[in-house]
UniProtKB/Swiss-Prot annotation:
Keyword Repeat included in the entry's annotation: yes
Matches recorded under InterPro entries: CFAP70 (IPR052628), TPR-like_helical_dom_sf (IPR011990), TPR_rpt (IPR019734)
Originating organism: Dictyostelium discoideum (Social amoeba)
Record flagged with keyword Transferase: no
Protein name, entry field: TPR repeat-containing protein DDB_G0285095
Extent of the TPR repeats: 87-120, 121-154, 162-195
Length: 263
């Protein structure tokens, strides 16, 4: 273990351990922490990642269950010691507790995260996902519904808002509320952050639920064409081309697209 001034890889860069959380507040002369300055309509995000590059290749890069693992535990606890009311860190700590099987403590931390910042879509999504994973669909529906009230009124959805509403759309689709799910999918792809996951999920919905082969294919292609390419959605579109278009040549191109991509 290096000394306190040593540098370690963090978010793909060499960053001193003491600076791992961006813009950590420092106490003023009275011992109080100043208010964090935030751009208008843009909330600060203190989520700790292993690295931005690896996260971009995950199925859902804004889901805390995708970008968090136990190797981050010490960093998250350290962050909470300095900022005990930070919504991002509380949510991420809840995910860690869930991974350790401490579901009661996990829910307490996740609930506190959304109480501290009701506009934190990533925390709401983590809370909803946690309830799904612990087989509590009734409570999950309540949480997603409450989260929707905070995210839906926004004219433009950012990445976290889109990811939250996508999780909600998938959840209510599984519950059989097809019309409501379709409205959510449409909202995400028209007003949300453009991502392979949202485009692909809507494409699958159109293909498998609405039985619209042509329109479903359009969205699957859009998902596969996004850079950096998603292995999952390139493969899904390749399979679509083989199954519905009998186009082996194009299917092979998309199957190879990930390995040929140069950033």
């Amino acid at each position: 273990m290096g000394c306190c001034g040593s540098k370690e890889k963090y978010n793909g860069e060499d960053v001193p351990k003491s600076q791992r959380l961006e813009n950590r507040p420092t106490n003023d002369v009275n011992g109080k922490q100043p208010q964090r300055q935030q751009p208008p309509n843009k909330r600060k995000n203190n989520t700790i990642r292993k690295g931005a590059a690896s996260a971009s290749q995950q199925n859902n890069p804004t889901s805390l269950f995708e970008i968090t693992d136990l190797s981050l535990k010490n960093d998250i606890i350290e962050g909470l010691q300095e900022q005990p009311q930070d919504s991002d860190l509380l949510a991420q700590y809840g995910v860690l507790l869930s991974m350790e099987g401490k579901n009661k403590e996990a829910e307490e931390s996740l609930r506190k995260a959304v109480e501290v910042d009701t506009d934190n879509s990533r925390a709401w999504q983590a809370y909803g996902e946690f309830l799904e994973r612990t087989n509590n669909p009734k409570k999950a529906k309540e949480v997603y519904g409450e989260a929707y009230k905070h995210a839906a009124p926004k004219i433009a959805l950012d990445e976290d808002d889109s990811s939250l509403l996508l999780s909600y759309a998938i959840f209510i689709q599984k519950s059989g509320e097809i019309d409501k799910a379709e409205k959510l999918y449409k909202r995400i792809v028209t007003s949300g952050a453009r991502s392979s996951e949202s485009l692909g999920r809507y494409g699958l919905f159109l293909l498998e639920v609405k039985k619209d082969v042509e329109k479903g294919g359009i969205y699957l292609k859009d998902a596969a064409d996004i850079d950096p390419p998603s292995p999952e959605w390139c493969t899904r579109y390749s399979n679509y081309l083989k199954t519905y278009k009998k186009d082996e040549f194009e299917a092979t191109k998309y199957q190879k697209r990930v390995s040929l991509y140069v950033n």
